[in-house]
């Protein structure tokens, strides 16, 4: 009679099993710590403020309400913010990826003269910034205030992303370029037609980072953009939360400052969901590239 093949876990020594179980328990707790707040925010955005305050989360749908979503989505400025945020994020991502990849390539070449000097210059900028006031004066003198370029250009280049891309380039065998040169490929042909297609994971990773960073950004827009028609989504949502004044009819229904505060709390949850939803939809499509890019960027220092 054939004996059943032991599982990999059963073959492990007792000490390894204990460590593995502890690791899974810690991982499970970590996952719960991430998932539970998200679930709470999603459910709380649909529950009327008073039942939520009195009895907490409930699955009694009679107590659920779309008031917060109706209020936020009925604001015409929210759609302008969505459009602006999408345009800014896409343009910023494209500019950032192009600049980063072009800067990382020569820095990955050991035969590039001045490589160490530029490395030092780049690293210095990671620790010392220009400061808010000097940057504002510079952007003002360049005539970029209240323009899209004020939020696209200053942060388009990231030294950290450049280092990750450089590390990825350095992990690609030099033989690949030598073979391309034998076939008559120029430096430009090698970079655009051979190297970049191999770098899809790191490109997707950098693009994801930059897109998320710009999508969630509001401070630069608050400083440099004065026109309401140019405000991104996060700034619009921030304004809604700060003002959080119900419509006149809603005030007469609730008739108290406490009710307005409860509505503001409900609006807070709804705005979190509205601002995060596009990223939640996008992330699964980039996850495989994101994981590969992170691992590839960590191979070398």
Residue ranges and their predicted role:
Residues 2-301:
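A hydrophobic, multi-pass inner-membrane permease signature
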């Amino acid at each position: 009679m054939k004996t059943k093949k032991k599982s990999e876990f059963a073959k492990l020594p007792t000490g390894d099993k204990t460590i593995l179980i502890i690791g899974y328990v810690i991982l499970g707790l970590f996952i719960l710590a991430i998932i539970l707040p998200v679930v709470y925010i999603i459910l709380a955005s649909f529950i009327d403020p008073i039942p939520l305050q009195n009895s907490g989360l409930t699955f009694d749908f009679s107590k659920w309400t779309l008031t917060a979503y109706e209020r936020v989505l009925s604001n015409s400025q929210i759609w302008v913010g969505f459009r602006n945020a999408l345009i800014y994020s896409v343009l910023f991502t494209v500019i950032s990826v192009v600049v980063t990849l072009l800067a990382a390539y020569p820095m990955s070449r050991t035969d590039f003269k001045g490589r160490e000097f530029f490395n030092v210059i780049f690293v210095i900028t990671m620790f010392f910034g220009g400061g808010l006031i000097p940057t504002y004066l510079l952007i003002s003198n360049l005539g970029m205030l209240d323009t899209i370029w004020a939020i696209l250009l200053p942060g388009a280049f990231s030294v950290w992303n450049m280092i990750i891309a450089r590390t990825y380039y350095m992990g690609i065998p030099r033989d690949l370029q030598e073979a391309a040169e034998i076939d008559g490929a120029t430096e430009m042909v090698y970079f655009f037609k051979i190297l970049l297609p191999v770098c899809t994971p790191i490109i997707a990773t950098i693009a994801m980072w930059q897109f998320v960073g710009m999508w969630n950004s509001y401070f630069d827009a608050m400083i440099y953009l004065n026109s309401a028609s140019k405000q991104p989504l996060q700034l619009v949502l921030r304004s809604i939360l700060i003002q959080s004044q119900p419509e006149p009819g809603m005030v007469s229904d609730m008739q108290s400052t406490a009710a307005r505060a409860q509505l503001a709390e409900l609006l807070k949850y709804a705005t979190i969901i509205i601002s995060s939803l596009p990223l939640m939809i996008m992330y699964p499509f980039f996850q495989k590239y994101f994981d590969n890019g992170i691992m590839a960027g960590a191979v070398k220092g």
